[in-house]
C-alpha cells in the first residue's frame, strides 16, 4: 500500500507542512544534484519489510539528479543456504564448491532489486518513473589469500574497477547495481565482502557520499544521546559498543573518508524515510562521518558579507529565510 502523507519524523503533514518542508529542503536538492552517491544495502536490509520504501526513496534521489551506485550484500541469505561455511573477521571463507550457490543467490537478490525499481503500479511512488538499472562486469577481483594463517580460498578483493564505464553509465541517467562478485582476468569468480566493496567503489569513483544502511539508527554518546557527526580519529571511542558487523561498516566508512570520499552516512533500514531525513534536513537522523576539519572555525568579518549573502541566497529564494538588505 502507498505510504500515508507524513513528515520525515513520521508525523502526518498538512499542506503547510509540505510547503515548509520543501522550502527547507531546496538547498539540499540543489546541493545533491549531479553528485555521486554509493549506497550499500546489506542482506538484512533486503529482507526487511521497509525495503520497498527505501527503494522508492532511492528512486526519488535518482529523479532529483543524484547519480547512484547501489551495492548489495547477502550475508543472511548465504548463511541460510550455507550453514556449514566458516567466517574469519566477518568474512566468509568461500569454498570452491559453494560458488554456484553464492552466484545463484546474488543473482536472485540482484533480480529482486531490479524488480523493485521497475514497479510502476499506479499506487506506488514509481508510477510513470523510468529508471534504467544496469549491472555489469565492472569489478576485476583477485584472491584475498592467506590472512592470520587462514586460506580464504575463493574469497576475493577488488583488483580494479572500470570507473570510466560506470561514470559513463551514470552520466546517461542509469542507476548502477553491483553484486559482491568479481572476476579475475582468467574468468574465475570471487566472492567479495560487500561492505568493503562499497567503500572501494566509493574511493575509486571519488564519490560525494557513501551511505550504509544498518539496523541501528545512529551512534550514541555515553549519555545515550545521538552522535550526529564523527571523524575517523574519534571513531575508536564508539567501536567497542558496536556489533562486529556494524563495526566493520563504520571502519569501511572511515577508510573511504580518509581516501577522499566527502562524507559517509549510516542510516537505519528500519526507519521509514530515514534516508530522506538524513539528506534533506539540517538535523538529519543518522550518523555522518567526515574527515578532520582542515580549516579552523573563526568569527565572520566584514569582508565575508558577500560570501555569506551567496550562501543564504537559496534559502531566501525558497522562503525559508526573510530577505534582508545588506
Predicted regions and their residues:
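Nucleotide/pyrophosphate-binding catalytic subdomain
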Residues: 4-266, 298-312, 316, 325-326
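Terminal amphipathic helices with adjacent charged low-complexity linkers/tails
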Residues: 76-78, 271-275, 281
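Active-site catalytic pocket residues across diverse enzymes, especially alpha/beta-hydrolases
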Residues: 82-85, 279, 283
